[in-house]
Amino acid sequence: MGMFHNHYGPEARYAVEREAELPTTKWEEEVARGLEYGLPGADSIVDKRIPTFSRGELPHFAGINTFLKAPYLEDVRRCGEYDVAVLGAPFDGGTTYRSGTRFGPQGIRKISALYGPYSFELGVDLRESITIADLGDVFTIPANIEKTFDQISKAVSHVYSSGAFPVVLGGDHSIGYPTVRGVAEHLDGNLGIIHFDRHVDTQETDLDERMHTTPWFHATDIPNVPPKNLVQIGIGGWQAPRPGVKVGRERGTTIMTVTDCVEMGIEAAAERALEVAWDGAEAVWLSFDVDCLDAAFVPGTGWPEPGGFLPREVLKFIQLIAERPLAGIEIVECSPPYDNAEITSLIATRVICDTLGCLVRAGHLPQRSTS
């Protein structure tokens, strides 16, 4: 171990020390596989780890755009062989203003190529810690919300029951109901929900349908998804319809505004969120709407609202929440057609990666015994 001078801060010191402890086994296997399947590089290539055809992480601008360049698993019956299963839910039929979130899974996958599997601050290398597969997208039905819900529920149910950790790429927030439904059916106890958003999303209907403003009304109608275990973080602004606020008040959900969280401190806010979501629950689902961030950071979303969180506040929240296990995560309302320099898709990718990394660091992933 090298010497550290006094100018290192505690986080930087931890990160640098931790990196030295991480294995490189999977990286070496990836290089060897690339040379075997992609052919050794041309004679003029000095670095003999470089193949002729791009395989694996490098270069970041090349390759097939699965999430984090994870293997594409055509046979979804095998998803239980992996620790994490990524699936897209390309649906924006529940949108009440800007559309385009049907392209969210594509946008997130595309920019995820920019990321490596190693997090400096977390001291985690996902490639060395867990296995990830990209299952592709659920076959959604653009003109039929209810059939799409059935498709999404079946897909999430399949992944969750396999033992893989589901990562769902939305899609508008109407998918929150069918994703929760797909998990809840496999639980003997209750399912809590930690919901990041600027909007309450608790109306019964909107525009006469179960739109992206309604998922938690219907999710908390599921017998083992009680409203007392729904905590909604970041709610505020001029886009919180009164019928939804009324439902939350009557059902006893917990709402935490941005100001609430900032004034009490992110650590205390996360502690409260965990207390509510886990109160008597068997498992907790994380539903992350990118519009919980200030609109300056997420222009590519269906209902942008100024006054939201800063990215570092959200990432700190995620780090604390993932100290406890999660049933899965969904990222919703990422609309690439309205994005600027892919920054909305970028933060969506970061939230997923930090969630996985923190779960690994806390010992919650992989979920299954390797014995």
Question: Where are the regions that the model predicts?
Answer:
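Conserved alpha-helical scaffold segments that buttress catalytic/binding sites
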Residues: G2-S371
